[in-house]
């Protein structure tokens, strides 16, 4: 499915379920990782997560589109468009849109960890973020710290 097809699908869903036209752009955003889609307030555009479409299919994508269109139409009308607003929850129920999308499975991307060791007391620190060993010292004895290992856990 490409951006033209997604634009057409969003326009059809908007007319069918909301009886109002969608007058802005709907696209896939390949950079989205943790959310099914997002409604951009400034531009009124809708961005959808391609990975959800690939993983869960068209039905889940339609649910996400309905959810984002709830944000869109309520914002355009000047009503409460945020998740906590009553207008938003009522419209979700009316169009049978999910309040939350399914969770994405844990990424198969390996977790990188860094292992540091104090030169004085031999205490080991395991960290996800790299640290500047010239700037930081051991929290126990104030000794120098050296990096002893960099591992890629999978």
Curated annotation (Swiss-Prot):
It holds the Pfam family SprT-like. The keyword Cytoplasm applies. GO terms for molecular function: zinc ion binding. Disulfide bonds: none annotated. Zn(2+) binds at residues 67, 71. Residues 7-148 form the SprT-like domain. Its cofactor is Zn(2+). Its main location: cytoplasm. One of its GO terms (biological process) is response to stress. GO terms for cellular component: cytoplasm. The active site is at 68. Coiled coil: none annotated. Binds 1 zinc ion. Keywords: Cytoplasm, Metal-binding, Zinc. It is found in: Cytoplasm. This is Protein SprT-like.
């Amino acid at each position: 499915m490409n951006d033209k097809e997604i634009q057409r699908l969003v326009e059809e869903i908007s007319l069918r379920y909301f009886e109002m036209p969608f007058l802005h752009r709907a696209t896939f955003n390949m950079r989205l990782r943790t959310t099914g889609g997002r409604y951009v307030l400034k531009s009124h555009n809708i961005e959808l997560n391609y990975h959800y479409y690939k993983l869960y299919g068209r039905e889940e994508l339609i649910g996400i589109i309905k959810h984002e269109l709830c944000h869109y139409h309520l914002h355009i009308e000047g009503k409460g468009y945020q998740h906590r607003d009553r207008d938003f929850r009522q419209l979700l129920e009316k169009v049978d849109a999910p309040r939350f999308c399914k969770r994405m499975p844990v990424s198969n991307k390996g977790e990188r960890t860094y292992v540091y060791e104090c030169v004085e007391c031999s205490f080991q620190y395991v960290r996800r973020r790299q640290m500047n060993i010239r700037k930081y010292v051991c929290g126990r004895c104030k000794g120098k710290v050296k990096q002893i290992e960099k591992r890629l856990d999978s």
